[in-house]
Every structure is written in C-alpha cells, then in structure tokens.
C-alpha cells in the first residue's frame, strides 16, 4: 500500500516543485496566530508575507492557494465573487460554522418563517466579541456561497431568506398534472439540506411561481 501511494504521488502535478523556505515561515507564523485569532484580513496576511520575504503579490496569491489546499488557511476569495469573501482568511474553521449555527439556531429566528433581518444578524452575532460588526457580512456571504440563504428581492440587502427555517406549513393547491411536464427524482437516501439548497439555487424562478411535490 505504501508503495502504491508513493507511486501515485509521483504522478501528481507540482509534487516535485521546490517550495521556498519563506513559504514555510509564513505557514508557521499563521499557525501561531491561529492559536489566538480566528481570522486574518488580507492586509494582515500581506504584511506577514512581506515580513517573511514573500514580497510579490503573485507569490502571495500562490502561497495562499497552497495554504488553502493544506487547510491551514481557508480563503474563498475570488475577484468576481459577488459575496466579497476575499478579504477574510479563515484561521479557525469553527469560527465560521459557529457563527452560522448561531444564526440558524436562534430561538426568536425560528418563529419568523425563515426571514433573517439585518437587525437579527447584529443582535445574534453582536453578542459575541468573536464576531465584530465588520465581519457580519462575511458570515452572511459564506451562508450565501454555500446556499444556506439568499437576499430577498427589493429588500436592499436588509432581509434574507433561510429555506432551512421555513415553516412546515403546506398549502392546498389544485394542480392539473395531466397538462404539465413532470419530472420525478428517486433517492435511496435523501441528502440532508438538498431541498433548502434547491430553493436557494432556483430562487430566480420562484419569482414567477413554482411547485414542488411534498413527497420528495
């Protein structure tokens, strides 16, 4: 088994590329920082790179991808990403999941039928010093990226819909299935969260109406 793994590793791209010692110096500094900090801004990351000899922006970007792949730093940044996540480098993944679960598990929010207001975000996350106000948009952006919520149209960024928290009320609908095109998907095991994520992904179609069978 060891020999087979070694053989396959030899086929991987960049496996034999030399890695500058300065990259490991930055990696060690970030590991030390992670003991006391949940995240680092892009400006802080760039300063740390500069201090350890990684001065070119292109090299800093390559190193950040390297650290992301290793799991030392998680960065979901993309200049074209509408969620604007590139300025926050995650040193402690639990910080993100903890913030998300604070929102999803809030007792008052469970009564709103899935509607999350900006004031709710400030109330829930603002009670914990680990989530300063300037990082609230990042937590929301991560929820949008992973299809946990989306902006309610015409709410000017002040209201969001969290499908996972929709009330389980069913409506009575008289639908003539004989006159429509029907698709049926069968799962041996229905993955958790697939219907809420489906709602997020198809949100632009909900504006003109939609109906999903209750037996899914």
Regions found by a protein language model. Give the residues of each.
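Extended, non-catalytic interaction/assembly segments in eukaryotic proteins
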Residues: 1-216
């Amino acid at each position: 088994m060891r020999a087979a793994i070694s053989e396959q590793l030899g086929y991987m791209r960049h496996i034999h590329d030399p890695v500058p010692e300065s990259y490991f110096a930055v990696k060690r500094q970030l590991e030390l920082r992670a003991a006391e900090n949940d995240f680092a801004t892009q400006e802080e990351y760039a300063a740390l790179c500069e201090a350890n000899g990684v001065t070119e922006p292109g090299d800093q970007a390559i190193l950040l991808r390297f650290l992301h792949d290793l799991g030392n730093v998680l960065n979901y940044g993309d200049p074209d990403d509408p969620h604007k996540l590139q300025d926050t480098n995650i040193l402690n993944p639990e910080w993100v999941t903890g913030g998300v679960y604070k929102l999803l598990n809030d007792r008052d929010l469970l009564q709103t039928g899935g509607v999350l207001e900006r004031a709710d975000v400030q109330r829930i996350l603002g009670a914990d010093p680990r989530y300063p106000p300037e990082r609230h948009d990042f937590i929301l952006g991560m929820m949008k990226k992973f299809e946990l919520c989306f902006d309610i149209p015409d709410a000017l960024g002040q209201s969001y819909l969290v499908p996972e928290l929709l009330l389980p009320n069913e409506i009575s609908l008289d639908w003539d299935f004989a006159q429509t095109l029907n698709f049926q998907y069968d799962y041996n095991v229905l993955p958790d969260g697939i219907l809420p994520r489906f709602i997020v992904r198809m949100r632009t179609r909900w504006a003109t109406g939609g109906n999903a069978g209750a037996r899914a």
